[in-house]
Every structure is written in structure tokens, then in C-alpha cells.
Design a protein with these regions (language model features):
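M16 family metallopeptidases and their MPP-like homologs
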Residues: 1-13, 19-31, 57-82, 104-110, ...
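Bacterial peptidoglycan biogenesis and beta-lactam-recognition machinery
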Residues: 13-17, 54, 115-116, 126-133, ...
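Active-site neighborhoods of enzyme catalytic cores
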Residues: 17, 24-42, 47
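His/Glu-based metal-binding/catalytic segments typifying zinc-dependent metallopeptidases
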Residues: 45, 49-53, 57, 135-198, ...
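Extended, regular secondary-structure scaffolds
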Residues: 115-134, 256, 334-337, 346-382
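Extended alpha-helical coiled-coil "stalk/arm" regions that scaffold and mediate dimerization/assembly
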Residues: 322-327, 370
């Protein structure tokens, strides 16, 4: 209830009308330094400058401008940094009055609550005390438009070759969000066509040398969902051939029919995901609310997009009616509501933009009178003073709070028992999981060198994506979707202190209980018989992962900076840099420049023989206890080789240093850290307090 009041206060009673500093801090403001140089700053302003360094963001914004020129979707929801300075404090207040009104609100409640108490708080403390206003109409739908082709430049570091870094993207409106069967069918088709390198469209484009990766994403969080079909990292001279090849493959699939086994596998996996309702870092109630609002905002029933019901029975019945083939024609090939965007790499566009901004700021500063410059300095001083001033006791007293006596001193209980199964340690977490079993295998790899850790991390990228002794990569892809909810691999580091850590290669699989035997059989096959010398598949995955890591570093520079700083003084963080951080990116980058990967193949085979085995293995299972699950785990463990005990000195901290990493962005990220003694829960609690994450 306390947190609910905090959010309701923030929405309906913000201090923005009496504290202009909030607008200047969160939105934007001018600053003059001691030499008289003018700059713009602000939380949202800086965030969006960082976002516009992301080629994906620029591409999606261009698609939405082209597809929805007459609707609010043509605007960037977070604000275009070139236009954010056009927002005045007065307009900001006006927009809040107009849009953040109970008359314009939808109220969604989720969770275990006393509903009468909650409704009374909503009514008595908030809704009834605010004057009704005009309810705003939902904007009209966009009429079909066939937009002219667009070319959008994006920044590339000087050391990166521009030649093969073009992107071709198609935008296609699918229909209306309330047509759930059509939207879900397009999600299924996106997996069948481009779900991985073995999917028909990806496979043919890669084999033809027309691009490094092919992606198809259904954007369904808007009134008229659209598909983005993208060929990534293609040369300029291959843009037209790539488009022609896309069309030719899609026409062939539409004419000859979509593979029924792949359709069934994709549907089985999507149905699992929708019924599981795992929203990752989002609380489940928040994730469900997105589906509720998709329908409710547009006049539908609130639960229309949430319940799975017979949705997949209907889709399966339409498989043999030619409906999926017709969708390919109607949405991807002959769509009157479409656009094409080409992303053009540039070594100079970023610097040109920064120089243009600098000249504009110089012009603005030169146009000010002495009085205007003094006013900006006064506002800046007021903002600095506001930042430095503590909240008054009266203000602090208004914050709802819990006493320590309101919180149980006991941690939340997760049922855990330690036993043995198949001769290896077993952690069992017996709880209801909607009929789903989650099995994790932890292979000890503590002691590997940094280079070896990077190779094992990459080996995890290959598992499930290359041929095995029993199946081709294409066959394996369909089987994994058919029998598994998920199967993934990662290198995870667990730190006890600055110099004590353990590292695990983790294999995770989830499946409904009736399919867990098949799922673990596939996991066994992947772990023990994967072809780790599959040249074409490995080369493709290597390039894709290198590009993905580059984008990750640019888009999440704060995470990269924190990890890099921590690796200077803790061994575990240094290992994580090789497994998942900047050192891993450098390792991938070096390998993508090599023409002979035979050394990598040999290293992968040698490491697989060392780390994949019963020795050093711990198994974890979550779900209701089941003999069938235990039997499947035992069978898997028995198939694994003995393996070796991994030994070695591991990775040492990198040592304290000042370090900088250049990225193509208008925004930089700084991180610093240091040792704080033995780790305990106090530091974790302090971290949540200072980062405000407790508001979630």
C-alpha cells in the first residue's frame, strides 16, 4: 500500500507545478561553464542522446515514421534529442494537466490484496479529489501508406570497416492489435522464417552471402502491430540483391507451403512461453498488464489478450487451409502498408552532429544579452543548490515507511534439499511450477585461463545451433522448439570474496513434465555429440555474436563500465570479463579477423572433453517431484563421460588502473569502484537504497 501511494502521488500530485528544478533536472537545462561555454544537460536528454547512438533505435524510429505519418507513433516516445530543447516548462505542465488525469486513466490491479482497502485509497485519497476533465479519444488508425525508401546514417567507430555494415529493413503493418490470431500467427512465422540460422529465410540468405544475420520481429505494443524484417551487415552493392533474394525465398515458401513440422514446433514453443508467463526482469503482474491494455485501450475486453484458451487449437486447425502461406503474401510480399529503410554506416556522422550541436550552442550563447546569461547562471545555481539541500524533516515525514518490526527477519523460504541422483549431487526445489520442470546442470570450470573461459562461453553459444551425431542443425532446431520450453547455456561466476570465486558452465532446460524426457535426451545429445568444427555455422555465429556484443557495449555502456572497473580488484569480475564482458568481445573480434579457425576448433574439442562430464557436475531440478523427471535426469547423467577435474590458477584481478573504451555515442559512461572488505547483506541493501531500485 505504501508503494501504491508513492506511485499515485507521482502520477497525480507531482511537485512539478511548484518545483521547476524537477523539469530542468529530469528534462533539460542550459549550463555555462567558467569559460562561458554553453552545454545542455538533463536526465532524459542524456538518456535519449545515448539511445540515438543505437542503430536499432534509429532504424525502428525511421520505420515508425514511415508507416505511421499521421499518428502519434511517428514521434519518438522518449523524445528526439534534437527536439527535446523545444519543450518548455509551461508546455510540460500543460501536458501533465491534459494527459495525467483520472478521466484519462485506466486502473489495473494485480496481486494478493484487500480489494476494499485498495479501492477506498484510490477513491478517497486520489480520484474523488480531482476534478473530472475531458477524456481524450484514442487516435484514429493510420490508413495504408507505401512510403518511399529511406536511408539513415548511423555512427560506426573509425576502426570498423564500413563496407559490410549496411542494413536492409522492411516494415510491414500486420493489422490491428485486437486480431490476436493474426498477430500470434505472425509471431509463429517469424520463428519459422528467421528464428535462427537454420530457419529457411536466414539459411538461404546466409548461404548466398547476403548478410550476416536475418531477423524478423513482430512489434505488437501498438494499435497496428508491424513486422520488421531485417538483413544485417550487408555490403552496399548487395542491398538490392538482398531485397530480391528475400522476395524470391518468401514467394517460394508461399507457393510451395510452409514446412508443417517447423510450424508445429514453433507453435508448441510459443504456446509454452505464453502459458509460462515468464516476463524476465518485469514483475509478472506488470507483464500481464501489457496484454490487458493492448485490448482494453482499444475497446476490447481486458482479458482478451491474456488468456491463451483455444488460441493454438484454432491456429493448428488453419495450418492445412493455406492460411499461413496467405499471411506471407498479404503481410510480407503484397502489403499496401509498407516501407523500406537502409541503414548506412558512417565514420563521420557522429562527429558532424556533435560539431553541429556545438555551433548551435555557440550561436545561442552569442545571441544572449548579459541579463539572459545571468538568468541561466542563476537557474543553474538554483538547481545546484536544490541538489545539495537536504529534505526538510516535514518533507521526510510525509514518506510512507515500514518499521523493521513490520519485516520478517527470516528470508523468503525456497524449499531446497541436497541429495544425490545418478552419482552426482542433486539440488531439489520442490514447488508448484504450472506442470513445468526446470533442470540445470552446473559444470565446474573454475581454474580455466581467461582465453579458455572465453572459448567455453562461445562453446555455449554453439550448443543447439550446430550439427550433432544424430541430427542436422536444422532438424535439431525444430526438435528443441517442439519438446523444450527453453534450452540455454551460460558461463556464470559466483564470488565469495575478492579472491575466492567459482565458475560454472550452466546448461538450463525447461519443458512440460510430459516432454522432459525428450528434452533431456536432446540436451544429452547436444552436450556430448555437437560438431564443434562445423565451419559455416561457427563462422556465422562468431560474426553474429561479435556484432551483438558490440551493440551491447554501446547500448549498455554503464554495465560494461561497472564490470570493467570491478575486474580491476576482484578475481571473479576479471573472469566475468572473459566470459561475458569486454575481454570476451575482444576475443571474438580477434577471431573474426582470422581466416583459419582450425585452432579454435581444436580448442573447443579439447575443452569440451575436459569440462563436460560427471566429475564436478551438480544438477538442480525445480518443480513438483516426479519419478519420470528423476529417471530422465539419471539417464542423462549416465550418458555423460567421466570428464576431468578442472585445475589451474584461473584469472587474477587486472590491477587498479585508469582506462577508457571509445564507443560511437554522444553520451559517455563512467564507473568507479573499490574493495569494501568482506561482502555481506548490508552492502546489497545499501546498493538498492542508493540506486532507488526498491521502487520496483
Amino acid at each position: 500500500l505504501n508503494l501504491m501511494r508513492v506511485y499515485l502521488d507521482a502520477v497525480f500530485r507531482p511537485l512539478i507545478y511548484s518545483k521547476s528544478e524537477i523539469f530542468r533536472q529530469e528534462g533539460w537545462h542550459y549550463e555555462l561553464d567558467a569559460e562561458g561555454r554553453l552545454s545542455r544537460k538533463g536526465v532524459v536528454y542524456n538518456e535519449m542522446r545515448g539511445a540515438f547512438a543505437d542503430a536499432d533505435e534509429l532504424e525502428e524510429d525511421a520505420i515508425m515514421r514511415a508507416l505511421f505519418p499521421d499518428t502519434p507513433y511517428r514521434f519518438v516516445s522518449g523524445g528526439d534529442p534534437e527536439h527535446i530543447p523545444e519543450l518548455t516548462y509551461e508546455k510540460f505542465q500543460e501536458y501533465h494537466r491534459r494527459f495525467y488525469s483520472p478521466s484519462n486513466a485506466y486502473v489495473y490491479l494485480d496481486g494478493d490484496m484487500d480489494i476494499d482497502t485498495v479501492l477506498a485509497i484510490l477513491d478517497d485519497e486520489y480520484l474523488s479529489s480531482i476534478e473530472p476533465s475531458e477524456r481524450l479519444a484514442v487516435p484514429a488508425l493510420q490508413q495504408p501508406v507505401k512510403a518511399s525508401p529511406q536511408r539513415i546514417e548511423y555512427e560506426l567507430p573509425a576502426e570498423e570497416d564500413e563496407h559490410d555494415r549496411y542494413r536492409l529493413a522492411w516494415g510491414r503493418v500486420v493489422g490491428e492489435i485486437t486480431d490476436r490470431e493474426r498477430m500470434t500467427a505472425m509471431q509463429v512465422l517469424s520463428t519459422v522464417l528467421c528464428g535462427n540460422n537454420q530457419s529457411v529465410l536466414s539459411r538461404e540468405m546466409l548461404a548466398a552471402g547476403l548478410g550476416e544475420a536475418v531477423n524478423m520481429i513482430v512489434w505488437d505494443g501498438c494499435a497496428q502491430p508491424f513486422v520488421k524484417l531485417e538483413v544485417r551487415n550487408v555490403s552496399e552493392e548487395n542491398i538490392v540483391p538482398a531485397g530480391e533474394k528475400l522476395r524470391a525465398v518468401l514467394e517460394r515458401v508461399a507457393n510451395e507451403g510452409v514446412d508443417r513440422r517447423e510450424l508445429e514446433a514453433a507453435m508448441a514453443n510459443l504456446e509454452f512461453q505464453l502459458r509460462e508467463r515468464d516476463y524476465g526482469y518485469y514483475p509478472q503482474g506488470l507483464g500481464i498488464s501489457f496484454g490487458v491494455l493492448d485490448s482494453w485501450l482499444r475497446g476490447g475486453e481486458p482479458d482478451a489478450m491474456v488468456e491463451v484458451g483455444r488460441l493454438f487449437d484454432i491456429l493448428r486447425a488453419r495450418m492445412d487451409e493455406g492460411w499461413f502461406e496467405e499471411l506471407i503474401r498479404a503481410v510480407l510480399l503484397d502489403n499496401p502498408h509498407s516501407c523500406e529503410v537502409v541503414m548506412v554506416p558512417s565514420h563521420t556522422v557522429g562527429e558532424e552532429r556533435r560539431e553541429r550541436d556545438a555551433r548551435e550552442l555557440e550561436r545561442i550563447a552569442a545571441s544572449w544579452s548579459r541579463e539572459e546569461a545571468e538568468r541561466v547562471k542563476a537557474e543553474q545555481a538554483a538547481l545546484d543548490g536544490w541538489h545539495a539541500s537536504p529534505d526538510s524533516p516535514e518533507a521526510l515525514a510525509t514518506l510512507p515507511k515500514l518499521e523493521l518490526s513490520d519485516i520478517s527477519p527470516e528470508p523468503e523460504h525456497y524449499p531446497t534439499s541436497l541429495g544425490e541422483l545418478g552419482g552426482v549431487p542433486l539440488l531439489r526445489h520442490e514447488l508448484s511450477a504450472l506442470g513445468i520442470s526446470y533442470v540445470s546442470l552446473y559444470f565446474n570450470i573454475t581454474g580455466l585461463t581467461g582465453e579458455e573461459t572465453a572459448a567455453v562461453s562461445f562453446m555455449g553459444e554453439l550448443f543447439g545451433k550446430v550439427d550433432t551425431a544424430g541430427h542436422s542443425a536444422q532438424e535439431l532446431s525444430s526438435l528443441l522448439q517442439l519438446y523444450c520450453g527453453s534450452m540455454n547455456f551460460s558461463v556464470d561466476v559466483y564470488e565469495q570474496s575478492a579472491d575466492k570465486y567459482c565458475v560454472k558452465l550452466t546448461a538450463r532446460v525447461s519443458a512440460i513434465e510430459s516432454k522432459i524426457g525428450k528434452a533431456l535426451g536432446l540436451l544429452s545429445e547436444v552436450l556430448t555429440t555437437s560438431r564443434l568444427d562445423s565451419e559455416r555455422e561457427i563462422t556465422d555465429i562468431l560474426r553474429q555474436r561479435r556484432t551483438g556484443m558490440f551493440q551491447q557495449i554501446v547500448n549498455n555502456g554503464h554495465v560494461s563500465a561497472l564490470g570493467r572497473a570491478a575486474s580491476q580488484f576482484t578475481a571473479g569480475s576479471a573472469v566475468n570479463e572473459w566470459a561475458n564482458g569486454y575481454d570476451y568481445y575482444c576475443w571474438l573480434k580477434r577471431l573474426t579477423s582470422e581466416t583459419d579457425l582450425s585452432g579454435l576448433y581444436s580448442q573447443l574439442e579439447e575443452l569440451s572433453a575436459r569440462v563436460i562430464g560427471r566429475r564436478g557436475l551438480t544438477v538442480s531440478v525445480t518443480g513438483m517431484h516426479s519419478e519420470a523427471v528423476d529417471d530422465a535426469i539419471t539417464e542423462l547423467v549416465n550418458v555423460l563421460p567421466e570428464g576431468e577435474t578442472v585445475t589451474g590458477s584461473g584469472v587474477a584481478p587486472r590491477g587498479v588502473r585508469r582506462e577508457g573504451i571509445e564507443i560511437p555515442s554522444d553520451v559517455g559512461y563512467a564507473a568507479m569502484g573499490g574493495l569494501s572488505g568482506e561482502f555481506d547483506g548490508h552492502w546489497q541493501l545499501a546498493g538498492r537504497v542508493v540506486s532507488l531500485e526498491y521502487l520496483w
